[in-house]
């Protein structure tokens, strides 16, 4: 297959991934409830703000859907490469990255979306679910036993997983079947770019944390 065709195919998949990532379930749900999550609480169109304003159950559903956006896009690329192209043509890392970009800057919602934490988790699972499990444990330990500030916990947890991405066999094991067909170093490289995106999306949270004004999470079990 000519190189320019491969480039065009990847660009098409990346565009589709961005548009898919731009589907924001937090906004869709809040619109269904005749509201706009971006006008409530922190103004963030993510599962944490949904938790504060609509309850635990729907927040967990949206969190799962945001994870699945990236993971399913990566899985689709894996099967397209396997059965349609019979070769590693579409770079799943780039597709996953574009899903995260779409989640943070959704074209369907005036480029104001979520912070990208859940969609980042979807990428991590695509590389190796072991890293995701370790990340979940770190996250829970921090938020339960140290600080109940979601943004702080996210900004600590996501970068802390980077060293694991640099372990070659993490993306070469059967559990990393989506990533194994690519050189191991691509996963940490793309992950660095995702970390930078997530940090930027939290710039307002960082400012509030410096001022001591960032909200502490409250576990509300009831839905509004």
UniProtKB/Swiss-Prot annotation:
Enzyme class label: transferase
Primary localization class, coarse: membrane
Membrane topology: Multi-pass membrane protein
EC number, as in UniProt: 2.3.1.275
Pfam families reported in the protein's UniProt record: G3P_acyltransf
Transmembrane residue ranges: 4-24, 60-80, 88-108, 124-144, 149-169, 182-202
Keywords from the named record: Cell membrane, Lipid biosynthesis, Lipid metabolism, Membrane, Phospholipid biosynthesis, Phospholipid metabolism, Transferase, Transmembrane, Transmembrane helix
InterPro entries linked: G3P_acylTferase_PlsY
GO MF entries: acyl-phosphate glycerol-3-phosphate acyltransferase activity
Record's subcellular location: Cell membrane
Keyword Cell wall biogenesis/degradation: no
Subunit structure, as described in the record: Probably interacts with PlsX.
Role description: Catalyzes the transfer of an acyl group from acyl-phosphate (acyl-PO(4)) to glycerol-3-phosphate (G3P) to form lysophosphatidic acid (LPA). This enzyme utilizes acyl-phosphate as fatty acyl donor, but not acyl-CoA or acyl-ACP.
Protein name: Glycerol-3-phosphate acyltransferase
């Amino acid at each position: 297959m000519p190189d320019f065709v491969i480039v065009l195919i990847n660009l098409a998949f990346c565009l589709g991934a961005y548009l898919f990532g731009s589907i924001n379930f937090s906004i869709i749900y809040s619109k269904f409830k005749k509201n706009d999550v971006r006008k409530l609480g922190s103004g963030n169109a993510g599962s944490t703000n949904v938790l504060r304003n609509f309850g635990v159950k729907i927040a967990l559903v949206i969190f799962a859907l945001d994870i699945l956006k990236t993971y399913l896009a990566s899985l689709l690329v894996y099967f397209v490469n396997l059965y349609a192209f019979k070769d590693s043509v579409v770079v799943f890392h780039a597709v996953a990255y574009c899903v995260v970009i779409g989640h943070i800057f959704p074209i369907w919602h005036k480029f104001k979306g979520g912070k990208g934490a859940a969609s980042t988790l979807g990428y991590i699972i695509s590389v190796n679910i072991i890293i995701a499990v370790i990340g979940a444990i770190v996250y829970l330990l921090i938020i339960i036993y140290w600080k109940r500030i979601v943004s702080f916990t996210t900004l600590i947890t996501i970068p802390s997983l980077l060293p694991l991405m640099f372990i070659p066999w993490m993306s070469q094991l059967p559990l990393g079947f989506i990533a194994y067909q690519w050189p191991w170093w691509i996963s940490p490289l793309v992950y660095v770019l995702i970390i930078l995106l997530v940090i930027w999306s939290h710039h307002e949270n960082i400012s509030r944390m410096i001022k001591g004004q960032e909200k502490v999470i409250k576990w509300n079990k009831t839905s509004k």
